[in-house]
Amino acid sequence: GNTADNKNIESAADMKQKKKRSPYLETLSLDGVHWHCRAVEFFDVTDWNNNLVAERDFIPYRRTGYRGNLLFARDGRDGNGFFFLKEAPCSSVQLGYPGSDFVCEFGNFTVSGIGASEADLKSSDWVKLYSCVTGVFGEGELSPLKALRAYQKNIREHRPERDEMIMMNTWGDRSQDSKVNEVFCLAELEKAARLGVTHFQIDDGWQEGKSPNSSVAKGSFRNIWDNPLYWTPAKDKYPHGLAPVVEKAKELGIELGLWFNPSVQNDFEDWEKDVEAVVKLYREYGIRVFKIDGLSIQTKKAETNLRKFFDTVLEKTD
């Protein structure tokens, strides 16, 4: 209804009523009623979303939920503050989502949504939930960003040769997979080198199997392993395999990357086969950079199996 019709908007008794609480990751109760907050929400599914970040500034009052993976809160009295980083997928695709990520009421702040339902939790199994990081910062606009960056640097060693890149992707010419082949890639590599590109990533179309986005044949993201040759170079496009393209890239000082889509059916039950496909490409061609696409994580089991896929690939490669 119309919010103007709300009753007891300033009733002290109404403000003290206890609200039903969902499972939460973290909560803080701090002094002061003049907190200035900013919630930052991110969006994936970039086929549909072109605006990938949304910020909302607010001063907490009545108990209200906000969406996002980041919450910055600054005390209006002295300028110091803290942040919550909810380590989880974007709000729109989280599992067991309670409708918001942060619940704020005056100086009370809670991170909600653990990434699982009651049915997902079993005494016999370890179930990984979403996590939360709390950090503090001082005055100034740069201070919270430096605090957040300090945490990120601590959890992952920065290696320029691995983490810094200028990538060129073959999908950008709007031809889908119709032009991708050995001759095309060799020519594109020459252009990429002139542009200073460090990584050349061949998107959908390099492989023998066909995806539903193929312009040359009707394919699917499901039941990929019905075709055991799905993740091998397409013979009609790459008659010599990927070796000539890999060698050309090395000559030009460019690293070659590939598109890869894990088999999604039955909660990624074929994750071990997907691991072997990626590891084989790494060992045969030295491919280290993969664009992972087409993910659909709708259950906790799917999330668990996908995590096994990523972790096992890391274990089997150096």
Identify what each model region corresponds to.
Residues G1-A150:
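N-terminal accessory beta-strand-rich subdomains and adjacent acidic, glycine-rich linkers
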Residues L70, N80, E251, T312-E315:
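A generic structural signal for well-ordered alpha-helical segments enriched in polar/charged residues
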Residues A150-E164:
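N-terminal amphipathic alpha-helix/helix-capping segment at the start of soluble metabolic enzymes
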Residues A150-K153, F200, D311:
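Short, well-ordered amphipathic alpha-helices
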Residues R156-E157, E190, K280, V313:
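Short, flexible, glycine/charge-rich loop motifs used to bind or transfer phosphoryl groups or to couple energy/partner
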Residues E164-K300, L306:
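Aromatic-lined carbohydrate-binding/catalytic grooves of carbohydrate-active enzymes
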Residues E303-D318:
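Catalytic-core region of carbohydrate-active enzymes that cleave or remodel glycosidic bonds
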